[in-house]
Amino acid sequence: MIVPYGPGSTPDVVARLVNDQLSKRLGHPFIVENKPGAGGNVGTAAVAKAKPDGYTLGVTISGPLAANTLLYKHLSYDPAREIAPISILATQPSVIVANDKVSGVTMPQLLDALRKDPGKYNYSSMGPGSISHLAMQLVAVRSGTDIVHVAYRSSGDAVAALLSGEAQLACLPPAAVVGQIKAGKLRALAVTSEKRSALMPDVPTLAEAGIEDVQADAWMGMVAPAGTPVPILEKLHREIVAILKLPEVVEQLTRVHMEPVGNTPQQMAAAIASDLKRWQPLIEKYKISLD
């Protein structure tokens, strides 16, 4: 089971949780292998080029399957032709947070402040082309505001920038900011999901603040090499759906601020297409490239 990100990353955590259960149910031990690099492209290419026999799977986020096809001019794999979706395993919203350098305690108040002083505030991200970058850029476009992007290398660095005052805003995974929110060091202004998150029910959606069409949930999905026999894919899908309903799995996912999904391959393919459609105009307009 290839994870195109490092040990301890969210895809890695989800992969190991599912891997343990899948190994038990199938009576065949899967081994999680981390292959990070190039925004997830290295590991995803390894899945795409693997023998399609059901013995090599991948757990990845949307990026290597959607946005990376736009951010990188030359990929060594074609996700549309070489990757078979199995199911989205889990999802989490991104959370827009602010430090005490920003006036206003609600998203509408923040928007008023941003419009009053265009370019005054900046936001930290986990890196160029990351969902934390693209989501905030889309918020700026949809709300008609001007927010300066400052890229960092990880969610931890992005949070550190908020706490030090180098940045005032960010759009980050709940796990990265919930501790600082509870401590009163950061304010949660909105989530990027279509509906309020069960994990943060008191935090409104962007739509509630009048900003439409900025769904930017981060999801983790299981894939296989294209050409894997349909009966194998169907069996894997059935097992995954059953695993994601286990109380202990739901509890462990909730503990890391994830919500289980377990949808169909067709629904996962639709999610990839939706992400591609959402990010393509933004990436092209602002000439965002990682080459």
Model-identified regions with their sequence ranges:
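A ligand-binding cleft/hinge motif common to bilobed small-molecule-binding domains
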Residues: 64-74, 138-142, 169-203
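Stable alpha-helical elements in mature extracytoplasmic
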Residues: 10, 14, 18, 43, ...
